[in-house]
Amino acid sequence: MRDGRRGDADPRGGRPPGRPARAGDARDPGELPRHRPRQERSLAALARVRVRVAGTSRSVTEATRELPLSRPWIDDREEELVLEVLRSGRLSLGPWIERFEEEIAERVGAPFAAAVSSGTAGLHMLCHLAGLGPGDEVITSPLSFVASANCFILEGALPVFADVDPSTLNMDPAAVEAAITPRTKAIVAVDMFGYPSELDELRTIAARHDLTLIEDSCEALGARYKGRPLGSHGTDAVFAFYPNKQMTAGEGGVVVTHSKDVRDQVVSLRNQGRSYGEGSWFNHVRVGFNYRWTDVQAAIALAQLEKLDRILELRADAAARYAQLLDSIDGIETPRSDDADHQRSWFVYVVTLAAEIDRARVMESLRRDGVATAEYIPCIHLQPYMREQYGFGEGLCPVAEGIAARTLALPFYTQIDADDQVRVAEVLRAAVAA
C-alpha cells in the first residue's frame, strides 16, 4: 500500500480478503477463460437445434437471433471474486477498492487513483476541485455524451463548444484556442470513441492561458498517445466502467492523477467530505457527495482487469474484421486508423454514411433484420435542454453536426463472432444499396 493511503474506509469493519489473482498467477490475462460464460453456453446449446429455412438447414440462432449493440464479457472469474466479497461481509469502501485503485494506477502509469461511482462523478469532482463556478466558461467537445458538459454545468459553469477534427472526431486544437475568452477557466478534452486527443497541443494551450485541463477518457481505457497510456501524461483523467465499455463493473469510474493532493481530495469528496486518519469516520471537513463505489463492483473490475490485454486484443481484431468487410461498401466510411502517435482503444464501432444515404431507412432495415444500431452520437449542444437553457442551435459546430447526422453504431463487443460480423456487413450492404 502506498504511503499516504488512506482513510475513507471505516476502520471498524471487515477483515481484508486474500489478494485477488493477478496477471501471471493462476491464469494469464491473455488466455481465454477456462469455462465459457453461461450466456455463451446457452447460445451454443440453442444453435444445435436445426430448422428448415428456405430449403436449407440453418440454426435457430443464425436465422432469428438478434445482435445487440454491446455485451460485456463476464465469466466464472467475476463470479468467483464477487462471491469472495459477499462472504467477507465487507461490501463497500473496503480492501477490494484499494486493491483495484493500486492495480489500475499501475496499469495506466499514474501514481494515484481513486475509484468512484461513475465516470461522470469523477469528472464532476475534478471540475469541483478546479474551483469552477457561475459565470466561468469551460470548453469541451460538442461530439460526446452529455456528461462531458454536465460535469461542469453542475458547478454553475457555462459550456463553450469547440468544433471537432473531421478525421479524429476530437476537438480541433485551433478551434479550442479560438474559443478562449477572459472568462474561460478550463478545458474538458474528450478522447472520442477511444481515439486519443492531441494532448500535447491542448496542454500547451492550457498552460499559455492558465487553464485547467481535464481529460475525459471514459471511452479510452487502454489507448496510447505517443507510445504511453492515457492517464500517464500528467493530466488528471477519468475512465469509466459502464457495461458497453472495454472493461466493466456494471457501473463505476476512476480518477487517475499525478497529484496526491488531488487523490486525497477526491477520496474525501466521494464520501461526503470525510477526513482521514484514526478516529475520523464521523469527521467531515468539506461539503462532499455520495460518489462511493462498492467492493462488489471492485471485484468485478479486478477480474476484468486481469484479462484487459485480451479484451483489447479481441476488440482490435473485431474492428479490423469490420474494416475489411465494410471496405467495399460504397457510401460507408470506417473509423480512422491508428498512426505513430495515436493508438485507439476500441470502445464502439461507428461508421459514417455518405450524405445522400437515408440513415433512418438504413437503421430501420438493420433493425428489421435483427441487427441493433443507433445514431451515435447526437451533438450535446443540440440536446433539448441545451437549446432551452443556453439558446444553442444548428450551425454552432458545423463539422460535428455534419458528422453526427451521418454516424451509425454497429454491434461491437469483445466476443462478437466473426460470422455475426459477416452477417452485419451483408445486412448493411443491402440496406445501403436499397
What are these regions (language model features)?
Residues 128-217, 224:
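PLP-dependent aminotransferase-like
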Residues 215-249, 278-284, 333:
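Conserved active-site segment immediately N-terminal to the catalytic lysine
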Residues 21, 28, 158, 212, ...:
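Residue-level detector of anion-binding/catalytic polar loops
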Residues 98-102, 110-114, 174, 178, ...:
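PLP-dependent aminotransferase class I/II
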Residues 52-91, 95, 411:
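N-terminal "arm"/small-domain region of PLP-dependent enzymes with the aminotransferase-like
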Residues 90-137, 151-155, 161-163, 228:
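Phosphate-binding glycine-rich loop
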Residues 1-59:
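Hydrophobic helical membrane-anchoring modules
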Residues 232-274, 295:
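Active-site PLP attachment segment
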